[in-house]
């Protein structure tokens, strides 16, 4: 059911007959007037004709069934909706799943998101990725697509090797019971990395010129300060690692040996230790994300790609390409594309893509080469029509390199259907984050802080603490999703839990208000008893908004813009709360007016229930 579409179709038919212009062309150019007194649906005439005679036409039919008046204002033809007929269209058979229309030709879509390095807890940067990825998957499912969510486990790189070295130097201890496991892993990684960097900087000082010396001393001071803070918190781990690392003459060689032994599966102990550490960290990730109701269908290990020889096959294929070249002493794939290919791959014409280095001088492959193999795997394993990678905007060029490489290696269809869903950074005021230095605000810390603020506000209002985690989830989700993905998010914990405006809890509160009005009603809703003359002011605005919901929701899903859906729901909540503060519903003595208002409440309740569910926010019956 799409009521506003029915309105537009009728209006387009009327105008098509009067102007002798194709009905579909008229329909596609409809707009909504900026001011409600102008009308409800508008056609800018110059978008459909350049004919001066038609541009100056002034007489139109009086209307139809859903359009009760047609009026011209300058170059615009405006239609005014017949409120009573629209009301009947919506509520005569009002479905419980009112909202997103199911797509006629569903696709199989893979959404890969979060994919954080398994070396420390998830932090605020991962938070935006995880929520966006989860909501994209939910939106696509709501539209009728078959969706598979995947997490790419980066277990074969230098960072995991540093973590592994630290863990081995500590004597392979068991995790403490009183600390979250990924937090403990992050401590080992950060301390090991800081100590390695300090030792390296000290060695470099003797061969540095004056300017380099000043810069390195400054960096060394910062590292030593951080090391001191870590030692205060974790003296046993720090002292043990400091002692063991000081005994190693060539620590880089140790790290490289771990990397090579793991990539080649040539040392069973290294393989077992890394898998153990990585899986421990993933358990911590899952525990954190479970609070936000985020789950994955599959976890894909980078090492499995290497061990299965998929990456070797890609290198072999690339080496036979006519685009292969030498680049700075390495083997690389030249990414020269014609303008048509760039357009198809969404790569700007003026951007020069650097060659894709396939193999390092030491024979190991880069992550971009592995990404080619992984992209093919994602399409293959799920028989996917489309793969969406949720990755920060800083990775835009590597993602373009990936698409270009696939295209030039003969996988043109896959390259064109590999989508980079880019997003901006999350800013926490006064905080510079660095996972390798152990300087970050973890997702768990954010959840706990939001939980504390929400708990205090619920207690102030005498609310239900049983819903606390659902309110925490909604506050965090809304704060992330209400901002367009390509813009940065400034995360202020105190502002995101506001029961009175512009927040997830505010929408939940509005839903609870609408639900409880209906729950207290003892009358059966009967459209034959409605007083249509009372569809005025905010009630009319709500009716028009209810009519528009399927169009707005479907467009938001198809364009992957959850912020549009949330913005629409917030607008409805604002109108509804303003109206409810001035007009009673259940206490209205006039049966016709009371029945009308109950139907309006029912419409708002359904929109909020279905809209919130789509974005992973639980509609609450009590707050």
Swiss-Prot record:
A motif ('HIGH' region) lies at residues 116-126. The keyword Heme does not apply. InterPro entries: Arg-tRNA-ligase (IPR001278), Arg-tRNA-synth_N_sf (IPR036695), ArgRS_core (IPR035684), DALR_anticod-bd (IPR008909), Rossmann-like_a/b/a_fold (IPR014729), tRNAsynth_Ia_anticodon-bd (IPR009080). Keywords: Aminoacyl-tRNA synthetase, ATP-binding, Cytoplasm, Ligase, Nucleotide-binding, Protein biosynthesis. SUPFAM superfamilies: Anticodon-binding domain of a subclass of class I aminoacyl-tRNA synthetases, Arginyl-tRNA synthetase (ArgRS), N-terminal 'additional' domain, Nucleotidylyl transferase. It is found in: Cytoplasm. One of its GO terms (molecular function) is arginine-tRNA ligase activity. Its EC number is 6.1.1.19. It comes from the Archaea. One of its GO terms (cellular component) is cytoplasm. Disulfide bonds: none annotated. It catalyses: tRNA(Arg) + L-arginine + ATP = L-arginyl-tRNA(Arg) + AMP + diphosphate. GO terms for biological process: arginyl-tRNA aminoacylation. It is an enzyme of class 6 (ligase). PANTHER family: ARGININE--TRNA LIGASE, CYTOPLASMIC, ARGINYL-TRNA SYNTHETASE. NCBIfam families: argS (TIGR00456), PRK01611.3-3 (NF002446). Belongs to the class-I aminoacyl-tRNA synthetase family. This is Arginine--tRNA ligase. It comes from Sulfurisphaera tokodaii (strain DSM 16993 / JCM 10545 / NBRC 100140 / 7). The lineage of its organism: Archaea, Thermoproteota, Thermoprotei, Sulfolobales, Sulfolobaceae. The gene is argS.
């Amino acid at each position: 059911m799409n009521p506003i579409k029915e309105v537009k179709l009728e209006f387009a038919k009327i105008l098509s007959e009067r102007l002798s212009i194709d009905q579909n062309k008229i329909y596609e150019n409809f707009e909504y007037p900026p001011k409600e007194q102008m009308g409800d649906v508008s056609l800018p005439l110059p978008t459909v004709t350049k004919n001066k005679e038609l541009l100056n036409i002034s007489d139109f039919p009086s209307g139809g069934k859903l359009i009760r008046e047609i009026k011209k204002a300058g170059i615009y033809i405006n239609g005014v909706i017949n409120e009573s007929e629209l009301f009947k269209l919506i509520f005569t058979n009002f479905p419980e799943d009112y909202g997103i229309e199911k797509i006629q030709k569903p696709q199989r879509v893979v959404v890969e998101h979060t994919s954080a390095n398994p070396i420390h807890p998830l932090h605020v940067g991962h938070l935006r990725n995880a929520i966006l990825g989860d909501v994209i998957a939910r939106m696509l499912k709501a539209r009728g697509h078959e969706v598979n969510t995947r997490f790419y486990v980066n277990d074969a790189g230098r960072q995991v090797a540093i973590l592994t070295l630290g863990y081995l130097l500590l004597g392979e201890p068991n995790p403490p019971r009183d600390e979250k496991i990924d937090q403990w892993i992050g401590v080992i990684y950060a301390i090991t990395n800081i100590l390695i960097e300090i030792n390296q900087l000290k060695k470099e000082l003797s061969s540095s010129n004056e300017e380099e010396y000043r810069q390195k001393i400054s960096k060394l001071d910062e590292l030593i300060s951080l090391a001191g803070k870590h030692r205060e918190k974790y003296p046993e781990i720090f002292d043990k690692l400091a002692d063991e690392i000081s005994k190693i003459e060539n620590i880089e060689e140790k790290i490289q040996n771990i990397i090579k032994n793991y990539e080649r599966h040539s040392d069973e102990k290294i393989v077992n230790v890394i898998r153990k550490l990585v899986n421990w960290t993933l358990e911590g990730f899952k525990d954190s994300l479970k609070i936000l109701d985020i789950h994955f269908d599959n976890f894909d290990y980078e090492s499995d790609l290497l061990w299965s020889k998929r990456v070797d096959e890609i290198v072999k294929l690339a080496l036979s390409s006519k685009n292969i070249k030498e680049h700075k002493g390495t083997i690389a794939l030249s990414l020269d594309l014609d303008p048509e290919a760039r357009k198809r791959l969404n790569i700007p014409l003026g951007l020069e893509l650097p060659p894709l280095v396939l193999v390092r001088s030491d024979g190991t492959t880069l992550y971009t080469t592995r990404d080619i193999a992984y992209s093919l795997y994602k399409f293959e394993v799920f028989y996917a029509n489309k793969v969406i990678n949720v990755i920060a905007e800083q990775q835009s060029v590597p993602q373009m390199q990936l698409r270009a490489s696939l295209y030039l290696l003969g996988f043109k269809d896959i390259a064109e259907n590999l989508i980079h869903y880019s997003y901006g950074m999350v800013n926490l005021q006064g905080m510079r984050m660095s996972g390798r230095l152990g300087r970050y605000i973890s997702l768990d810390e954010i959840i706990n802080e939001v939980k504390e603020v929400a708990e205090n506000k619920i207690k102030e209002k005498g609310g239900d603490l049983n819903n606390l985690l659902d309110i925490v989830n909604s506050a965090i989700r809304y704060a992330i999703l209400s901002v367009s993905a390509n813009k940065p998010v400034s995360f202020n914990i105190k502002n995101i839990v506001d029961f009175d405006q512009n927040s997830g809890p505010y929408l939940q509160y509005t839903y609870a208000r609408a639900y409880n009005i209906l729950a207290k009603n003892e009358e059966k809703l009967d459209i034959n008893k409605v007083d249509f003359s009372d569809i005025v002011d905010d009630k009319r605005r709500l009716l028009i908004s209810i009519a528009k919901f399927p169009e707005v929701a479907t467009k938001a899903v198809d364009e992957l813009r959850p912020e549009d859906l949330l913005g629409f729901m917030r607008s409805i909540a604002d109108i509804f709360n303003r109206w409810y503060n001035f007009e009673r519903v259940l206490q209205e003595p006039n049966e016709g007016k009371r029945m009308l208002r109950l139907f309006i409440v029912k419409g708002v309740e359904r929109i909020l229930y279905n809209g919130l569910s789509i974005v992973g926010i639980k509609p609450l019956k009590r707050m």
